[in-house]
């Protein structure tokens, strides 16, 4: 990881809005068929979700469509939070 790394966050929009890697792009797994065409097959990127399951699904879909230019982050955002990777401040998404 470097500050110039491209990061794709496949969590739901609300999860991303609550807290995310500072430079990550929100691309929910539910809409992968919409955003997959925007991926540059020559540019490396990191792929993550909350814990690893959704990014594993996204990785399988990407690989099935010929993409090999990514690294799936094992453990997802939970593990990322334990590192020095900069994240946004948490914003509660619950409304009373």
Descriptions of predicted regions:
Residues 1-96:
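Rhodanese-like catalytic fold shared by cysteine-dependent sulfurtransferases
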């Amino acid at each position: 990881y470097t500050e110039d790394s491209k990061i794709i966050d496949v969590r739901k929009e609300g999860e991303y809005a609550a807290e995310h890697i500072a430079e990550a792009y929100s691309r929910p797994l539910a809409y992968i068929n919409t955003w997959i065409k925007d991926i540059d097959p020559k540019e490396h990127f990191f792929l993550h979700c909350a814990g690893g399951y959704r990014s594993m699904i996204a990785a399988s879909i990407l690989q099935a469509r010929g993409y090999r230019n990514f690294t799936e982050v094992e453990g997802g955002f939970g593990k990322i939070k334990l590192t020095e990777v900069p994240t946004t401040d948490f914003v509660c998404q619950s409304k009373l």
